[in-house]
Regions:
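Bacterial N-terminal signal peptides
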Residues: 6-20
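Short coil/linker segments at helix-helix boundaries
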Residues: 25-128
């Protein structure tokens, strides 16, 4: 019975979070801000407070080894401010080699996403 209650509670929470994201009206969004995800901020050159928030969330997610979620947050920051190089740096950081993948014998940056992202960041580096 406790498992059933926990399952319904988790389902309700997920529905609540995603319905709020959908209600915000941005159907092209690649990620949402996860409440309670921390407060660390690393200022980047951007005029978009939302892009800054997603960049910060990307760092916090990467530090927690939530790499797919981190990449989604960085991609959303890049979508919101396409001229900022740092979201692309973040994608490279999260998509590139990490100790866990090497321990499992997985290849570094198997699809080349990290290399492509760092190249894009270098192209935009003069923007800030």
């Amino acid at each position: 019975m406790r498992r059933l209650i926990a399952l319904f509670g988790a389902a309700f929470l997920l529905i609540n979070v995603f319905s709020k994201a959908y209600a915000q009206g941005d159907e092209g969004a690649l990620a949402i801000i996860v409440p309670g995800g921390g407060t660390y901020s690393r200022p980047i050159t951007t005029d978009s407070e939302e892009a800054q928030a997603f960049f910060d969330q990307g760092i916090r997610m990467a530090w927690g080894f939530y790499f797919p979620e981190s990449i989604a947050s960085y991609q959303e920051a890049a979508r919101l401010d396409p001229d900022s190089p740092m979201p692309h740096w973040g994608i490279a950081h999260a998509a590139g080699p990490n100790p866990n993948s090497r321990y499992q014998g997985l290849p570094d940056d198997p699809q080349g996403a990290g290399l492509a992202a760092i190249r894009r960041a270098m192209e935009l580096a003069d923007n800030g």
